[in-house]
A protein has these predicted regions:
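N-terminal "first-domain core" detector
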Residues: 1-39
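Amphipathic protein-protein interaction modules
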Residues: 64-79
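Generic alpha-helix signal with a bias toward terminal, lower-confidence helices
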Residues: 24, 28, 60-62, 76
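Conserved aromatic
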Residues: 2, 61-64
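Short aromatic-glycine-(Arg/Gly/Cys) micro-motifs in beta-strand/loop hairpins
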Residues: 30-59
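Non-transmembrane, interaction-prone segments in cytosolic or luminal domains
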Residues: 20, 48-50, 73
Length: 79
């Protein structure tokens, strides 16, 4: 099942708030910036990937099927 990005963001804000992390906006977009930043990929099989790219080259990738694992990564990386 393909997760709706808006639903994922809403779930993240609730999850982060319960863990004492306050976010004004979702920390990742869904398109690569190719400038050393990260983006989120949501795969059709339900997998989430946090991917870093720099000048078109993938430099980092973390994948999971778990929303809570994804949310923990985002809090760890951006809080």
């Amino acid at each position: 099942m393909l997760e709706d990005f808006d639903t994922l963001k809403s779930d993240f804000f609730l999850y982060a708030r319960r863990r004492g992390a306050d976010f004004d906006e979702f920390p990742l977009g869904i398109k690569p910036d190719n400038l050393g930043g990260r983006h989120l990929e949501i795969k059709a099989d339900g997998r989430f990937a946090v991917v870093g790219t720099d000048r078109g080259i993938e430099t980092e990738r973390r994948e999971t099927y778990s929303k809570s694992a994804l949310f923990n990564w985002l809090i760890e990386l951006y809080a």
